[in-house]
């Protein structure tokens, strides 16, 4: 099997992002976005998905966190799409129901070539640490659009926003890793292409 590694750089007037993604890693990461809570969520994603990621993001945080978080989602999606290549042999589908204390989250994915996000999560507070809670859905919307995957995220229960968000990123890492697992040498579609 070829190494499933991708390097992506994106520079706009709002952000500059460099990322290296190894799908078949062991959970090592070096993450710097300037947004502590977001860094923590990406670390959880890497640890639970066993992805190796190096990301350095510089953005217009003097305005807010929107451009940085959204653009990291875009770059992660681009890196994933590049690393997964023609998707030959992957499992394609995965789902999980993951608890974190009182929070219970369902995440399901189809590496389909069709971008779609169903995000049924409400946060009680406007901020998660210094991160705008509305940016969680924007991160996933950006990832889904660039990675060309179908992703469902649903909060079954949860009172503590931190627990809910942690459970989402842990579950996301686990389902993405599982769906990327090589199970044979065929394209997982009756059409013969994804």
From Swiss-Prot:
Which HAMAP family does the record match to this protein? HisB
InterPro entries per the UniProt record, alphabetical: IGPD_sf, ImidazoleglycerolP_deHydtase, ImidazoleglycerP_deHydtase_CS, Ribosomal_Su5_D2-typ_SF
Name the Gene3D superfamilies on file.
Imidazole glycerol phosphate dehydratase, domain 1 (3.30.230.40)
Q: Where in the cell is it found?
A: Cytoplasm
GO terms classed as biological process: L-histidine biosynthetic process
Annotated catalysed reactions: D-erythro-1-(imidazol-4-yl)glycerol 3-phosphate = 3-(imidazol-4-yl)-2-oxopropyl phosphate + H2O
Query: Which pathway is this protein assigned to?
Result: Amino-acid biosynthesis; L-histidine biosynthesis; L-histidine from 5-phospho-alpha-D-ribose 1-diphosphate: step 6/9
Q: Could you cite one Gene Ontology molecular function of this protein?
A: imidazoleglycerol-phosphate dehydratase activity
Q: Could you name the Gene Ontology cellular component terms for this entry?
A: cytoplasm
Broad class of enzyme this protein falls into: lyase
In terms of domain of life, where is this protein from? Bacteria
User: Cystine bridges: which residues?
Assistant: none
Give the record's family classification.
Belongs to the imidazoleglycerol-phosphate dehydratase family.
Under what name is this protein listed? Imidazoleglycerol-phosphate dehydratase
């Amino acid at each position: 099997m070829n190494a499933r590694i991708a390097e992506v750089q994106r520079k706009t007037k709002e952000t500059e992002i460099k990322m290296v993604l190894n799908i078949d890693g062991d959970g090592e990461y070096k993450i710097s976005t300037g947004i502590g809570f977001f860094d923590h969520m990406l670390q959880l994603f890497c640890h639970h998905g066993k992805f190796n990621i190096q990301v350095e993001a510089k953005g217009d945080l003097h305005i807010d966190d929107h451009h940085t978080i959204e653009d990291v989602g875009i770059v992660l999606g681009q890196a994933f799409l590049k690393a997964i290549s023609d998707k030959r042999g992957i499992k394609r589908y995965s789902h999980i129901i993951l608890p974190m204390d009182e929070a219970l989250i369902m995440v399901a994915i189809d590496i389909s070539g069709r971008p779609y996000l169903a995000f049924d999560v409400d946060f009680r507070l406007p901020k998660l640490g210094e991160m705008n809670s509305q940016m969680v859905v924007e991160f996933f919307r950006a990832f889904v659009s660039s990675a060309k995957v179908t992703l469902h995220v649903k909060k079954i229960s949860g009172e503590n926003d931190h627990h809910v968000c942690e459970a989402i990123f842990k579950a996301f890492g686990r389902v993405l890793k599982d769906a990327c697992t090589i199970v044979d040498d065929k394209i997982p579609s009756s059409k013969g292409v994804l």
